[in-house]
């Protein structure tokens, strides 16, 4: 870690005498071995060979399954496996992935996500044709726990190529899911790893904004990555306590320094408004499930993001519903 950014792990360059492939596909895992087979299969189906691609699973000391057995069964000697000596948390596990990578291009692929045919070929084309870019990402699809596709990410532009004015777009909201993006290793070497100040959300978005502030970014219009959503995400502790939005507010404050001074205030307000509405959306879903505690916390975080009438009115309306529901619940008990 540097003195300037003590919360970001330094990513040292690869030793000069190390053989380097083009790709490092680094797969962080934690208690997701039931999905890891699908993840590995999607990568191995596009494997150009060990001289071109490093494939390695980095496990954060899983307690509920055996990812090493899956690697040995499906990948044999082709896929490397490394396990932390103790659970270190997802951000430090990401750091380990970056530090153990040898390739010129790094793809962090969560152990429950997948890539579609053509992912590595198409994104490598972006780097080959545009030596100045720091990262490339593609449109992505969301899938559920059973692998069924649910919806597709927004189309950022009509044709593949370098994105224009990308910093002012990515700073407004999270537009990239991790399995869809590839980053030059030298970019991580220059900018450092993921910021450790986040507890559950925001570390990836902050990184993508950081990269956009320093490098051009290339975009592939074909949806070649699959991001898995879990039904448990809404009931997770980070959402019920509001920590997810707390992390987002922290990220918004951090990325402000990457913005042009004359535009920083306006863009920051737009971002805060977006995530205030996002929190109210969570609050509404939690309220519908009868989770008053979680709904109240999301309403609170929404108002901490933005206290304009656009946020206050729906927050007040939802709070009133929760209040009357509590009264009715008490009446029913008598």
Question: What is each residue range found by the language model?
Answer:
Residues 1-42:
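N-proximal low-complexity "stem/linker" segments adjacent to membrane-targeting elements
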Residues 3, 160-169, 223-231, 236-263, ...:
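Catalytic core of nucleotide-sugar-dependent glycosyltransferases
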Residues 41-52:
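Short, acidic, metal-binding catalytic loop of nucleotide-sugar glycosyltransferases
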Residues 59-69, 86, 110:
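A conserved acidic beta->alpha catalytic loop
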Residues 67, 84-101:
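Glycine-rich, basic loop-to-helix element that forms the pyrophosphate-binding segment
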Residues 106:
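Short aromatic/hydrophobic "clamp" motif used to bind/position activated sugar donors
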Residues 118-151:
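Conserved donor NDP-sugar-binding/catalytic core segment of glycosyltransferases
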Residues 160-243:
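Conserved nucleotide-sugar donor-binding catalytic segment
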């Amino acid at each position: 870690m540097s003195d300037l950014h003590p919360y970001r792990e330094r990513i040292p360059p690869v030793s000069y005498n190390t053989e380097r492939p083009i790709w490092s596909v680094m797969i962080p895992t934690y208690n997701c071995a039931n999905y890891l087979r699908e993840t590995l299969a999607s990568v191995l189906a596009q494997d150009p060979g060990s001289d071109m691609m490093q494939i390695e699973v980095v496990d954060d000391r899983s307690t509920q399954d055996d990812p090493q057995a899956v690697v040995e069964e499906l990948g044999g000697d082709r896929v490397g496996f490394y396990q932390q000596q103790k659970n270190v948390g997802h951000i430090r596990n990401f750091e380990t992935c970056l530090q153990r990578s040898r390739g010129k291009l790094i793809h962090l692929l969560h152990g429950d996500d997948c890539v579609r045919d053509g992912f590595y070929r198409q994104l490598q084309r972006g780097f080959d044709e545009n030596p100045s870019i720091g990262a490339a990402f593609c449109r992505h699809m969301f899938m559920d726990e059973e692998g069924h596709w649910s919806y597709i990410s927004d189309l950022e532009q009509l044709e593949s190529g370098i994105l224009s004015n990308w910093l002012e777009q990515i700073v407004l909201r999270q537009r990239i899911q991790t399995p869809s993006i590839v980053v030059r290793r030298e970019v991580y070497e220059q900018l450092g790893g993921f910021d450790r100040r986040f507890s559950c959300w925001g570390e990836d978005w902050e990184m993508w904004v950081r990269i956009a502030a320093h490098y051009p970014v290339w975009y592939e219009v074909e949806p070649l990555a699959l991001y898995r959503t879990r039904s448990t995400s809404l009931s997770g502790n980070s959402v019920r306590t509001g920590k997810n939005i707390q992390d987002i507010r922290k990220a918004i404050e951090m990325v402000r320094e990457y913005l042009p001074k004359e535009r920083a205030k306006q863009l920051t307000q737009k971002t805060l408004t977006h995530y205030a509405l996002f929190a109210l959306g969570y609050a509404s879903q939690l309220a519908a499930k009868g989770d008053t505690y979680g709904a109240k916390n999301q309403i609170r975080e929404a108002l901490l993001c933005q206290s304009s009438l656009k946020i206050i009115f729906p927050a007040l309306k939802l709070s009133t519903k929760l209040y009357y529901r509590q009264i009715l619940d008490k009446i029913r008990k008598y």
